[in-house]
């Protein structure tokens, strides 16, 4: 009779109440239970108050209650009915597996990446080609402009040269006219003297031979003097240029004088002399070979870039800026 009453009384008590009563009978505090079970004091308090924390899974809560029961010597079988009410097992929600292929997604992503890569490559190639074409076009326009300027300057020089030649010829004709009219009087006087004076034939022959010999000596002496004047000493600061193809160029010395400006043909050569340093503009650097003071001038950096060469040749040998 008493056993049945005790059993009914135990069933009336909840799990938390039974664990608290057993703890108090053993003289343990909530802090001591929490330290032995390695739990928080708040967790022990929730178990004794029959609370199920929302952030705690039911599986862990049931394990904590069983450990608490073993600690205070309460049979686990007596707590099972209360555990079902306090910490019921919750069915885990399993999300349905998506029906897709990982390989297909990866292939699709790789396809987009490859398309973007090709697009970037095409843009880079297009911009590079446009830049090269603009640069090439600008160089051609610059060469054409310089060639037109040099042609206009050459035409102006030719016109001025023709005017100087015409003036020189006019002056020469004016100077020659008195010289041609002057010998008229001696002819008349010579004729008169001839009428009054008879010259011996032998004397006339001697005078004629002497005159012709003197003229021969004079004419033979003239080329020697002219050759001596026409052979000046070579200038050490001269620029020597040989052309392997058609090339436009302009050469200016330190005084600003244009030594040459125009087009040179294939297999042509130039020998220019002026005051150093020289400033050069060369339309096709690969078509010309330059020597200064007997040493070649390096144009390789202009040939590699295929640009119009603008350089200054200093007084030092083969130094170009």
Swiss-Prot record:
GO terms for biological process: regulation of cell shape. Residues 167-190 are annotated as: Disordered. Residues 133-321 are periplasmic. Keywords: Cell inner membrane, Cell membrane, Cell shape, DNA-binding, Membrane, Signal-anchor, Transmembrane, Transmembrane helix. Residues 30-49 bind DNA. SMART domains: HTH_XRE (SM00530). Residues 1-111 are cytoplasmic. Its main location: membrane. Coiled coil: none annotated. It comes from the Bacteria. The chain crosses the membrane at residues 112-132. Residues 19-71 form the HTH cro/C1-type domain. GO terms for molecular function: DNA binding. It is found in: Cell inner membrane. InterPro entries: Bact_Cytoskel_RodZ, Cro/C1-type_HTH, Lambda_DNA-bd_dom_sf, RodZ, RodZ-like_C. The helix-turn-helix (HTH) motif in the cytoplasmic domain of the N-terminus is involved in the formation of spirals to maintain the rigid rod shape. As this protein is anchored in the cytoplasmic membrane, the HTH motif may contribute to protein-protein interactions to form the RodZ helix, which is localized beneath the cytoplasmic membrane. The C-terminal domain may be critical for determination of the rod shape by probably interacting with enzymes required for synthesis of the peptidoglycan layer, including PBPs in the periplasm. Belongs to the RodZ family. PANTHER family: CYTOSKELETON PROTEIN RODZ, PTHR34475. This is Cytoskeleton protein RodZ. The lineage of its organism: Bacteria, Pseudomonadati, Pseudomonadota, Gammaproteobacteria, Enterobacterales.
């Amino acid at each position: 009779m008493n056993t049945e009453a005790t059993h009914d009384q135990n069933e009336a008590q909840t799990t938390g109440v039974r664990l608290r009563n057993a703890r108090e009978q053993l003289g343990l505090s909530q802090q001591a239970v929490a330290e032995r079970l390695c739990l928080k004091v708040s967790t022990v308090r929730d178990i004794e108050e029959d609370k199920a924390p929302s952030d705690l899974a039911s599986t862990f809560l049931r394990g904590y209650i069983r450990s608490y029961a073993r600690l205070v010597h309460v049979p686990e079988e007596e707590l099972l009915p209360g555990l079902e009410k306090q910490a019921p097992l919750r069915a885990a929600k399993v999300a349905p597996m998506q029906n897709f292929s990982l390989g297909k997604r990866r292939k699709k992503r790789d396809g987009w990446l490859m398309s973007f890569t090709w697009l970037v490559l095409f843009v880079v190639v297009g911009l590079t080609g446009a830049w090269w074409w603009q640069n090439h076009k600008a160089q051609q326009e610059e060469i054409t402009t310089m060639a037109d300027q040099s042609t206009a300057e050459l035409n102006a020089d030719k016109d001025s040269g023709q005017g100087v030649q015409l003036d020189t010829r006019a002056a020469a004709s004016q100077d020659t006219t008195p010289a041609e009219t002057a010998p008229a009087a001696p002819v008349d006087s010579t004729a008169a003297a001839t009428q009054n004076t008879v010259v011996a034939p032998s004397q006339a022959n001697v005078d004629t031979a002497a005159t012709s010999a003197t003229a021969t000596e004079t004419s033979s002496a003239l080329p020697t003097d002219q050759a001596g004047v026409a052979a000046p000493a070579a200038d050490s600061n001269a620029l020597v240029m040989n052309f392997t193809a058609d090339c436009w160029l302009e050469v200016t010395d330190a005084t600003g004088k244009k030594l040459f400006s125009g087009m040179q043909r294939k297999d042509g050569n130039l020998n220019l002399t002026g005051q150093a340093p020289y400033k050069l503009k060369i339309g096709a650097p690969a078509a010309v070979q330059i020597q200064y003071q007997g040493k070649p001038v390096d144009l390789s950096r202009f040939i590699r870039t295929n640009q119009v060469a603008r350089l200054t040749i200093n007084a030092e040998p083969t130094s170009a800026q």
